[in-house]
Every structure is written in C-alpha cells, then in structure tokens.
Amino acid sequence: MAENNIQLNEQEEKKSLNFVQQIVADDLAAGKNGGRLSTRFPPEPNGYLHIGHAKAFCMDFGVAEMFGGTCNLRFDDTNPAKEDTEYEQAIMRDIKWLGYDWGDRLYYASDYFQQLYDFAIRLIKEGKAYVDDQTSEQIAAQKGTPTTPGQESTFRNRSVEENLDLFTRMNAGEFPEGSHVLRAKIDMASDNMHFRDPIIYRIILSPHWRTGDKWKVYPMYDFAHGQSDYFEGVTHSICTLEFVPHRPLYEKFVKELAGDKVDEYCPRQIEFNRLNLTYTVMSKRKLLQLVKEGLVNGWDDPRMPTLCGLRRRGFTPESIKNFINNIGYTKFEALNDISLLEHSIREDLNKKANRVCAVLNPVKVVITNYPEDKVEMMEMDNNPEQENAGTHQMPFCREIFIERDDFMEDAPKKFFRMTPGKEVRLKGAYIIMCTGCTKDADGNITEIQCTYDPDTLSGMEGANRKVKGTLHWVSARHCKDAEVRVYDRLFAVENPSADTEHDFRDLLNPESLKVIENAKIEPFLAENAKEGDKFQFQRIGYFCVDQDSTAEKLVFNRTIGLKDSWSKQNKK
C-alpha cells in the first residue's frame, strides 16, 4: 500500500467527519490512487450560481483543503446554445467571494473535445456505439419503463463503416440539429434506465464561445463528465443525489476509457443531498423565468437565492458557509428552513456591523424646553460586541425625528414607547416626556411636543432612573435623506416547488419589497457609508449599502430584521 503523505491537521482530527470526508479519509488511508486527492467543481456556464451550488463547491474545495489535496474548477461547456462568458466570469467571481481559489487549475470540458471525439470513434469501431436517425420523441418512447424492457432501435445494428461515415458527416455539419444522435450500445433490457443505449453525442450548430465552429457534435453530460474527471486526474467526483442512478454509467465509461490501467487510477463518484430552502426556488429554469419576465430585478436581485443576490442583500461569505456547515451533508433529501440562514447572518453581523441610527418612517419631535440654537454631540458606541470598535459623534438638537410607530396618543398599558405623560429614553441622549401632539385636518400626527430633563444625559447620575422605553432618533437639522429597500422572503408559501395546484409565479410574496424614498439617517452614516458596507440600524435590523447609491443619495438594502417576524406569524 502506498504511504499516505496527506494527513489531517490536528484541528480537523478533533472534529467528527461527515460521510463524504470519511470516505475520502478511508481512501487515502488505503493508498488508493497513489494516496492522491483531487476534486473538482464543474458548473455549466449558462446561469448564475445560487446557494445550492455553494453547498456543492464548499464540499469540493473544502474536502480538498482539509486533506491537503487540490480542487479543479472545470466549466462543463458542452451546450454552446446556452452558454456565455458573462456566466463564466460571474461564477468565478462568486467562488472567490466565498474564499476559494482554484489557482492554475482552471479547465473546460471543451479542452477534451478532441479526446472525447476520439473515444467515441473508438467505441464505434468496437461496435459499442451507433448513429440513430430517430427523433428524440421516438427514442424516448422506445426506452420502456423501470418494469418493462425497452425496444431496440432499427438503426442499432448498422455496420461500423456506416456509423463512422454518419458520425463524421454529423460533425461536418451535413445534418440539421435533431436529425441524428450517437448512442452507446449497452442493454435495452437493463434495470437501470440509463443503460438503455444512452445518447452520448448530439448535433448543435451554434458556434461555441471557445472553439468557434470547429465542432458540430457535442457530448452529453454522462459521456463528458466522467471522462473529463479521468483526463484531469480527479480522484473523487462529488455530486448531488440525483446522480446516483448515473453512477453505474459513469463507472462504465471510465473503465472503457481506462482499459487495463483502471486498477492504477479510477475516479470515484460520491453523492450527497442537495440544498433545498423554504420560501424560495432553486430551479435554474424557474429563476431564469423570474428574471426574464421582470418579476425580479435581475439575477442579483436581493430576493434571489443567487450568490450575487445574497451578496447584494448584505450576506457575508462567513454566514453562508456557517449555514452550510450547520445543515450538513447527508444521503437524505430535506427542506431546510430559511430561518437557519437568516439566523446565521444575524449572528455574523451582530459581531461585525457598526450600530447607527436611521428613522424609516419619521415624525418630528420638538423638545420645547431645549435651547433653539444649541447643538450637543452625543457619543455613540459603534459596536458593543467589539471591545475596540470605538465610538462616533451624533448631533442632538431641539428638533429630532423618531419612528412614527414609536408614538401612540392613546396607548394601552403595556405600550412602553412614547405617549403623552410618560417618559422615554433617547438612545445615547436624554430622558424626555411627551406633552402633546399636533395633527392635520385628516387627524394625522404632524408633530410631537416633548420636554427634556437636562440631568438625564447618558452617563449622568440622573440617567439611571428607571425608564422602560428607549427610542432611536436622528437630529432633524443634521440628518440626511436615504432610500431604503426593505426586502423580505421571495415567496409567500413555505415550499412553492411542492404546490402542484398553482403556477409558482402566483405564489410570490407581494410584500417582498417595500421602498422607502426618504428615510432619515444620521450624519456619521451619510458621510462614511460605502458600497457593500453593512450596518445595524438600531432597533430595526441589518442593512447594507447598495450599488445604486450616488453621491447625492445613499441606497440601503435590508439584509434581515433584528428578529424573525415570520415565526410569530406562523404561530398564529
């Protein structure tokens, strides 16, 4: 047995391994593939990565990192009609954002088109593949069912010479798309439907974004994938559970390709459960539909489960990776509660985000006994969770804004915010008491009058007296306007994919986006916020600066509220 030079570091040894990591550890201990470990992440460049893909590549890169191996990034670019460099660049950006790097190990399935074509020619010459002229519908009809065998194609017994001639002409562009396919000749009575003479090549006349017009025939996933793994020296091909029935075909083609060298090196396919999340969809087709029909504002809409959407919303790489680690990898499909992801970002931003004051639905408060021209600078903690986070200054004056919901003229007994005749504390400032309010002709409150106690400034002895309510606020004279986009869950139902009675688009949450045009923010925030920065708006939630921000007006996206409001609704 080859000596295994790849060892777990001491920290990892102390952790319990998931089943994929255990398989890898056992293979390395047994000296398989010369004690090497090489994984790969093989996305198709035909869309943006979502959090489900992140679970996959966190495993691919993570297990390689854990055991001192390597992980390749290989684009499965076998369908030129749907692929684009835009997606390629976005995929690479998202992987790097989560903290992974493939180094010089960037590959494409198209790197192996000649080798795959040569392998197909070899199979034809050995009588193991044939050209079929039937339509895809006819071929599907002949496949049979899991309990009844399929029917052999009338073209199954063509001569090697005829098959070689037709396949060569297919690649020369002599035939239209859909007119001919190359099928592996295996067993139309096999219990495994994937063994019933699977299609391994089809005609696509669209130019390829890397190879141009060189090829007119392109390999199917089952034919390209395992062989690409073999060409690259991949030892562990990790994928999701829907590929379990494909594994025997993966192994068959690899063994055909490797021949008598299969005992020296052979990649192994391992499957784990995919990530399914409540209140969203993971289907690339459905997500594309939402984008194309304008039901969301692009792939990076902060309501989308795409990594670029989560990034724009304010999710951090650490929160996503922690969530993925917490839900784990198993062999059983499950629907994961989105509240676990939301908890992960709350936990992360609680440690990292500076606290600031912003008033989303403002009403003016006039402190009638405070000098009109006086301005005091109040010292506000940036983040009490961090010892060295420091403080910032916030101006206080006679007129301030508070949240309209923080005032009630006729309040019930357990209302501890502002109401006439009761005291409340202004965060970092004074204790004030409401003395009255002004209304317009429709009965809407336009102004609240209060008095303050000058001996209750935060830090003074008078500030210690018991007051139940504490409100956030901003100076009316010094605050700036900002746009705030309050995002919520994309769908109104827990599992939109399971609802067979409704079109999934009819299940969208109509309250998933509310735009507040003129929220009031404190000067410190207005002067220091940069695109992507994350803050806690005190008593409201976590927000980040959006890319639509301008020098004149900042735009903030709500990442998540301070508390899970959905759990309360669901308990009702």
What annotation goes with each model-predicted range?
Residues 33, 100, 129, 176, ...:
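Intrinsically disordered or highly flexible coil/loop and linker segments, enriched in small
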Residues 38-46, 71-78, 230-238, 301-307, ...:
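Glycine- and acidic
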Residues 264-344:
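Long, charged, mostly alpha-helical binding arms that flank functional sites
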Residues 243, 247, 251-253, 318-321, ...:
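Core subunits and conserved enzymes of cellular information-processing
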Residues 63-70, 226-232, 295, 302:
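Residues forming anionic-ligand binding surfaces in small-molecule and nucleic-acid pockets
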Residues 2-152, 215, 242-269, 274-276, ...:
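N-terminal Rossmann-like or analogous alpha/beta NTP/dinucleotide-binding catalytic cores
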Residues 77-79, 85, 122-287, 345, ...:
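Active-site cores that bind ATP or allylic diphosphates and position pyrophosphate for catalysis
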